[in-house]
């Protein structure tokens, strides 16, 4: 083993995100805008770069143009120092087919691993909102002697049925891993909590390569990291769980320590935005010691004119609020809210315009939506249901580029 372990980051960014439709109608899930200045992929990339993991392959597939462009424009590193973040589309190296699962994505990209020859592989998902120092997880992985380490977060057992659940012993060795079980296991120290997988893994390179190659030869496999690779390694006694609550991110507050959100549904996506807007936010975007990097557009500052009022909200650069009221909302860049309009409890994505006297409540407006003067969204449920998507929790979602 080399004195300084060599690490290659692999970001699994091929997710289709069907449950986020219509936000994923024209883009991959990791490319969905979030938080006024970011895309979902920016959180994992920021965590890796902040930890000085600067060789990163982002495996893409589904409607990846905007994701590829975002990475190319906003995540350029110094190639002279061997540093890179590069999007890698499906290579079709073993036949004329796309990735059949997350494990197959790595299998089709094994040449990247062979070329870099890393000691460890940091394999993280691309569609969660969180801060994490992966270097601490790597130290745990090396110290545990495991071939695979899974980042786990504790959730109430009643909420765990939607996740991959981890049954571990007192030492952290995983005894069983089950996708979405009806009866989730408790943790060794709290029977009312369950460790669920965050979709973040660290592998000793040979262990993962051997497992990936064996999985590729298994005609009965779905070629999924959580559903196939991890159970294979658990059965071999090679997997451990890393307790995310032990991860200490510089600059974290008591309010947002160990914050992690799976934003795979419209309601979860909306709720995670509402976590940003209070005086003491549940997730703090303003941590300068562990920054989240996002869009690098050269935009003018936001402007509030003619008595425009903004309370408990995040407003992106280039936005103009003119004699309008914005409360408990997240507005992305270049949003215009005209005279007399009201925006409450809503998420407005880049380039949207809310016309004079319009009302937007409990809604998500995708990029470049135009709401005409006096129009209402989130006010009349029956009318909204006829024209827009509505989440299980009642959030009205207007797709990209719609004129109302």
From Swiss-Prot:
Residues the entry annotates as binding alpha-D-glucose 1-phosphate: 99, 164, 179-180, 197
Keyword Nucleotidyltransferase: yes
InterPro entries noted in UniProt: ADP-Glc_PPase, ADP_Glu_pyroP_CS, GlgC_bac, GlmU/GlgC-like_hexapep, NTP_transferase_dom, Nucleotide-diphossugar_trans, Trimer_LpxA-like_sf
Key words of the record: ATP-binding, Carbohydrate metabolism, Glycogen biosynthesis, Glycogen metabolism, Nucleotide-binding, Nucleotidyltransferase, Transferase
Reactions catalysed: alpha-D-glucose 1-phosphate + ATP + H(+) = ADP-alpha-D-glucose + diphosphate
Pathway: Capsule biogenesis; capsule polysaccharide biosynthesis; Glycan biosynthesis; glycogen biosynthesis
Superkingdom, natural source: Bacteria
Any Gene Ontology biological process: glycogen biosynthetic process
Classification via Pfam families: Hexapep_GlmU (PF24894), NTP_transferase (PF00483)
The EC number(s) this enzyme carries: 2.7.7.27
EC category name: transferase
MF annotations from Gene Ontology: ATP binding; glucose-1-phosphate adenylyltransferase activity
Family, similarity comment: Belongs to the bacterial/plant glucose-1-phosphate adenylyltransferase family.
Function in brief: Involved in the biosynthesis of ADP-glucose, a building block, required in the biosynthesis of maltose-1-phosphate (M1P) and in the elongation reactions to produce linear alpha-1,4-glucans. Catalyzes the reaction between ATP and alpha-D-glucose 1-phosphate (G1P) to produce pyrophosphate and ADP-Glc.
Entry protein name: Glucose-1-phosphate adenylyltransferase
């Amino acid at each position: 083993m080399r004195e300084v372990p060599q690490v290659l980051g692999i970001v699994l960014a091929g997710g289709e995100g069907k449950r986020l439709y219509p936000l994923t109608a024209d883009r991959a899930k990791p490319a969905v805008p979030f938080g006024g200045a970011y895309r979902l992929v920016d959180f994992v990339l920021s965590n890796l770069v902040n930890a000085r993991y600067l060789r990163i392959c982002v495996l893409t597939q589904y409607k990846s143009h905007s994701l590829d462009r975002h990475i190319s424009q906003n995540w350029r590193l110094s190639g002279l120092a061997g540093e890179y973040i590069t999007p890698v589309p499906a290579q079709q190296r073993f036949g004329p087919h796309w990735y059949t699962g997350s494990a197959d994505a790595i299998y089709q990209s094994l040449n990247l691993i062979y070329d870099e020859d890393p000691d460890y592989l940091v394999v993280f998902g691309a569609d969660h909102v969180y801060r994490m120092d992966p270097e601490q997880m790597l130290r745990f992985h090396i110290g545990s002697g495991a071939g695979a380490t899974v980042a786990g977060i504790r959730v109430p057992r009643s909420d765990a049925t939607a996740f991959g659940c981890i049954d571990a012993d007192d030492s952290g060795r995983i005894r069983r891993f089950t996708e979405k079980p009806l009866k989730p296991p408790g943790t060794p120290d709290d029977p009312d909590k369950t460790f669920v997988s965050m979709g973040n893994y660290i592998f000793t390179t040979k262990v993962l390569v051997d497992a990936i190659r064996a999985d590729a030869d298994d005609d009965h496999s779905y070629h999924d990291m959580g559903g196939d690779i991890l159970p294979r390694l658990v059965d071999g006694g090679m997997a451990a769980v890393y307790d995310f609550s032990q991860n200490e991110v510089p600059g974290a507050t008591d309010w947002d320590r160990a914050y992690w959100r799976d934003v795979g549904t419209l309601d979860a996506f909306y709720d995670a935005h509402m976590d940003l807007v209070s005086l003491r936010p549940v997730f703090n975007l303003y941590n300068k010691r562990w920054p989240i990097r996002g869009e690098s557009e050269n935009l003018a500052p936001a402007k509030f004119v003619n008595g425009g009022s903004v309370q408990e909200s995040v407003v992106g650069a280039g936005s103009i609020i003119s004699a309008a009221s914005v409360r408990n909302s997240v507005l992305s860049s270049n949003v215009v809210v005209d005279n007399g309009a009201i925006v409450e409890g809503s998420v407005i994505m880049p380039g949207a315009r809310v016309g004079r006297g319009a009302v937007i409540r409990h809604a998500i407006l995708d990029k470049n939506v135009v709401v005409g003067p006096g129009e209402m969204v989130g006010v009349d449920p029956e009318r909204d249901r006829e024209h827009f998507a509505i989440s299980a929790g009642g959030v009205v979602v207007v797709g990209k580029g719609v004129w109302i």
